[in-house]
């Protein structure tokens, strides 16, 4: 009985370690995107505020319209 419980606990630990690896890679990706333009929609990350892309850099949006300030 102890062997079955031990095997179950070891399996659960291995499974949780395997599941944690892709999440860490996703967190690194979002940290890298935070300062630059997002490639799929040419806008800056939402965490950087109201900004838009100009080339590969994020710039502030004008308050009165939706154009980028230079």
Swiss-Prot record:
Q: Can you list the disulfide-bonded cysteine pairs?
A: 37-53, 44-58, 52-68
Query: Any keyword Transmembrane?
Result: no
A Pfam family the protein falls into: Toxin_7
Where are residues bearing Leucine amide located in the sequence?
69
Q: In which tissues is it expressed?
A: Expressed by the venom gland.
Q: Which residues form the propeptide?
A: 21-34
Q: Which GO terms describe its cellular component?
A: extracellular region
Please list the GO terms describing molecular function.
toxin activity
Cleaved signal peptide residues = 1-20
Subcellular location, record wording: Secreted
* Recorded domain comment: The presence of a 'disulfide through disulfide knot' structurally defines this protein as a knottin.
| Function text | Insect active toxin causing rapid but reversible paralysis in crickets. No activity shown in mammals. Does not show effect on mammalian voltage-gated calcium channels.
Q: What is this protein called?
A: U2-agatoxin-Ao1m
- Origin species, per record, is Agelena orientalis
């Amino acid at each position: 009985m102890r062997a079955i419980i031990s095997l179950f606990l070891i399996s659960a630990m291995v499974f949780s370690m395997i599941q944690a690896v892709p999440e860490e890679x996703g967190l690194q990706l979002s940290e890298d995107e935070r300062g630059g333009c997002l490639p799929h929609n040419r806008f800056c990350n939402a965490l950087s505020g109201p900004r838009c892309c100009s080339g590969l850099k994020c710039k502030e949006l004008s308050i009165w319209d939706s154009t980028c300030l230079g």
